[in-house]
Design a protein with these regions (language model features):
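Asparagine-centered strand-capping/turn motif at beta-strand->loop junctions
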Residues: 2-8, 114
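Short, structured beta-strand/loop micro-motifs enriched in basic residues and often containing a Trp
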Residues: 135-143
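A residue-level signal for conserved active-site and pocket-lining positions in enzyme catalytic cores
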Residues: 19, 125, 153
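Hydrophobic residues positioned within well-ordered beta-strands of beta-sheet architectures
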Residues: 1, 16, 87-89, 123, ...
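Active-site/ligand-binding surface loops and adjacent short beta/alpha elements
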Residues: 11-13, 21-105
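Short, acidic/polar linear motifs in exposed loop/turn regions
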Residues: 7-10, 166
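Short Pro-Gly-centered flexible turn/kink motifs
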Residues: 2, 148-165
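Glycine-rich active-site loops that engage anionic ligands at enzyme catalytic sites
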Residues: 93-132
């Protein structure tokens, strides 16, 4: 659960996000399950700058609401899902065992990643309110894509849930 309180007299600009990682036997073949979705718009990361390549989104096609992680899935580092597209995503081992579900009704963005070309034994499912800059952005924080704002004297509260199944 997160609570943001603005005790100042000016608007507060902020980003917050969770960074849960889940152990898997092997990244290869894991399933990402997006219930009720047939496809998603996905923004990759420009690795040299560490910024979002929002001008070149990819379409992530799903088969029966499922995307199977392959050898090159995380070549662009993080799959970023903007505009509140993802409110719930499940991660399942390739053999169908061990399923974990992230439920994040207020997340404006969700990042899914594993270290580039490492076949590391984990995948991160991250709910975000705000995210990294778009490639080439040089403006002020208040103008940053996805930045959250909170008026003086106000507070904001939200939470996400992780469900672990066998």
């Amino acid at each position: 659960e997160w609570t943001v309180k603005n005790t100042d007299t000016k608007t507060l600009y902020y980003s917050i996000g969770g960074h849960p990682a889940f152990n898997v036997d092997s990244v290869m073949g894991c399933r990402l399950i997006f219930e009720g979705m047939d496809k998603l718009s996905c923004t990759g990361i420009d690795l040299p700058t560490g910024t979002a390549d929002a001008e070149h989104p990819a379409t992530l096609a799903l088969t029966d609401h499922v995307y199977t992680v392959g050898e090159h899935t995380f070549d662009a580092d993080t799959m970023v899902f903007d505009e509140g597209q993802v409110k719930k995503v499940s991660l399942q081992e390739a053999d169908g065992t061990k399923r974990v579900t992230l439920i994040c009704p207020d997340a404006k963005h969700v990042g899914i990643w594993s270290p580039v070309q490492k076949n590391a034994p984990f995948i991160c499912l991250e709910p975000w309110l705000g995210r990294c800059d778009n490639k080439g952005f040089t403006g002020e924080l208040k103008d940053k894509y996805g930045e959250q704002s909170l008026e003086a004297g106000k507070s904001f509260r939200t939470a996400y849930e992780i469900v672990v199944e066998k």
